[in-house]
Amino acid sequence: MSKPKRERSLPDNEAKAIARMLRVSPQKLNLVAQLIRGRKASAALADLQFSRKRIAVDVKKCLESAIANAENNHDLDVDALIVSEAHVGKGIVMKRFAPRGRGRSGRIFKPFAQLTIVVRQVEAEASA
């Protein structure tokens, strides 16, 4: 006897992907997440392709994963997808030390963040 299957937390027309342990501050990651929020998936991919931010590569990977989840796991139309959510969460903060003069030391904070992207399929009448 196995455990009962957990109910799906998203509606049937949505798919999501989560990128964890991204080595960037949540504030900088949110700048890139704001670019793609509410946009069509294809336009968001194009924006990330030509963004000069370092973390845009990881955001693009996460968006491509969400699109692949929508297509393969939920049978959604890739051309009708929009980025309905792109939210950023805090991760751990690694603390390192840097030697300073006179025997002192300074702290270096190395923050991590996580990104959740939810894509939703819009109907033909809504996108027209």
Swiss-Prot record:
Top-rank taxon, per record: Bacteria
What the entry lists under InterPro entries is as follows:
Ribosomal_uL22, Ribosomal_uL22_bac/chlpt-type, Ribosomal_uL22_bac/org-type, Ribosomal_uL22_sf
Task: Spell out the Pfam families in the cross-references.
Answer: Ribosomal_L22 (PF00237)
Any one Gene Ontology BP term: translation
Q: Which GO terms describe its cellular component?
A: cytosolic large ribosomal subunit
Give the record's keywords alphabetically: Ribonucleoprotein, Ribosomal protein, RNA-binding, rRNA-binding
Which GO molecular function terms does the record list?
A: rRNA binding; structural constituent of ribosome
Assembly with partners or alone:
Part of the 50S ribosomal subunit.
**What family does the database annotate?**
Belongs to the universal ribosomal protein uL22 family.
Function description: This protein binds specifically to 23S rRNA; its binding is stimulated by other ribosomal proteins, e.g. L4, L17, and L20. It is important during the early stages of 50S assembly. It makes multiple contacts with different domains of the 23S rRNA in the assembled 50S subunit and ribosome.
Spell out the NCBIfam families in the cross-references. Answer: rplV_bact (TIGR01044)
- Official protein name in the record: Large ribosomal subunit protein uL22
Q: Which organism is it from?
A: Rhodopseudomonas palustris (strain BisB18)
Source organism phylogeny: Bacteria, Pseudomonadati, Pseudomonadota, Alphaproteobacteria, Hyphomicrobiales
**Gene name as annotated:** rplV
